Curated annotation (Swiss-Prot):
Region of interest (Disordered), ranges: 1-51
The protein's name in its UniProt record: Large ribosomal subunit protein uL15
General function of this protein: Binds to the 23S rRNA.
Gly residues biased stretches: 21-31, 42-51
Subunit composition and interactions: Part of the 50S ribosomal subunit.
GO cellular component, one term: cytosolic large ribosomal subunit
Protein's organism: Bacillus cereus (strain G9842)
Domain of life: Bacteria
Keyword Plastid (UniProt): no
Length: 146
């Protein structure tokens, strides 16, 4: 391979199609818009979701549920991620934030029992699943609900 033999990858360089520039281009005169009608006009076209007057899908489907304004969203931390801390560490939401285990606190931290914990840790969080609580205590650690 020599410098003058280099070619761009097949299909990576596409020439822009200039419409309305003469009959010989194949896209002259009507510029690919056909004859008359809403879509041939400048600024023409139908709004999003319009189905030609037929009742649109978003109106045919029923409404469902509601948004609970009191919903609490907990940041989830699994037991397997707690193994990165040294034995005897007090694991708090602030520590999890500064070590980059979680990116934001939301409404608190919930510890779930995915994986296993091998270290003796004092874990402080807003919520624990019952199996996570048992696993931490079985490993010799302690659990504290904030």
């Amino acid at each position: 391979m020599k410098l003058h033999e280099l070619k761009p990858a097949e299909g990576s360089r596409k020439v822009r199609n200039r419409v309305g520039r003469g009959i010989g281009s194949g896209n002259g005169k009507t510029a690919g818009k056909g004859h008359k009608g809403q879509n041939a006009r400048s600024g023409g076209g139908v709004r999003l979701g319009f189905e030609g007057g037929q009742t649109p899908l978003f109106r045919r489907l029923p409404k469902r549920g509601f948004t609970n304004i009191n919903r609490k969203e907990f940041t989830i931390v699994n037991l397997s991620t707690l193994n990165r801390f040294e034995d005897g560490t007090e694991v708090t939401p602030e520590l999890l934030l500064e070590t980059g285990v979680i990116s934001k606190l939301n409404d608190g931290v919930k510890i779930l029992a995915s994986g296993a914990v091998e270290k003796k840790l004092t874990v402080k969080a807003h919520k624990f699943s019952s199996s996570a609580k048992e696993a931490i205590e079985a490993a010799g650690g302690s659990v504290e609900v904030i």
